[in-house]
């Protein structure tokens, strides 16, 4: 079951499996109280969240990671993301209101390879896999569910592809995603795009 959570400028998603769940992305740092209100409104409690996973480590997608992990949420990181875990540290340190927030807790990360993601998700009762889609940033990943729902973070929308003819990395990412025959594309900031009706 997928629940879209909107409490700022970034679409975040709660994906519940039969044996666990994933919170995909957060909003910017400093939005914790709005996050609490949004999950309560949707009948979700903090203890319902097994793992947090960011589609990438730009500040508007991982701002609450440190706080949520310190409160007991497990921290899932893909191996392709490790070099970029602290990308936003300097950005947050320049903001007086945010500089005291906990940094990304790299020592608590459970790092897995994309090739092992299907088995990892299956253990949570979630059917799907996680693939590297590095055209937006080197650490960007996409979560593709077997139900046809696909979560691409800040990947440039496919409808703009004609304007990016020379961007081979973007074309490669979309070819990879489309090989799964997705039904719905969930973006980090834009409305979802329905490709196939059931």
What are these regions (language model features)?
Residues 102-135:
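Internal catalytic-core helix/loop-beta-alpha segment
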């Amino acid at each position: 079951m997928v629940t879209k959570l909107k409490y700022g400028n970034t679409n975040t998603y709660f994906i519940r499996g039969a044996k666990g769940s994933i919170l995909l992305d957060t909003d910017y740092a400093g939005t914790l109280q709005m996050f609490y209100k949004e999950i309560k409104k949707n009948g979700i409690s903090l203890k319902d969240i097994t793992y947090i996973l960011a589609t990438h480590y730009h500040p508007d997608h991982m701002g609450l990671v440190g706080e949520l992990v310190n409160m007991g949420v497990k921290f899932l990181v893909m191996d392709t993301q490790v070099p970029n875990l602290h990308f936003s540290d300097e950005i947050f340190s320049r903001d007086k209101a945010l500089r005291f927030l906990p940094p990304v807790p790299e020592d608590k990360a459970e790092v897995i390879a994309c090739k092992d993601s299907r088995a990892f998700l299956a253990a949570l009762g979630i059917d799907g896999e996680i693939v590297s889609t590095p055209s937006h940033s080197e650490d960007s990943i996409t979560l593709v569910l077997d139900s046809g729902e696909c979560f691409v973070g800040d990947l440039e929308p496919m409808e703009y592809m004609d304007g990016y003819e020379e961007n081979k990395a973007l074309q490669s990412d979309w070819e990879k995603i489309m090989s799964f025959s997705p039904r719905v594309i969930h973006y980090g900031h834009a409305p979802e795009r329905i490709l196939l009706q059931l």
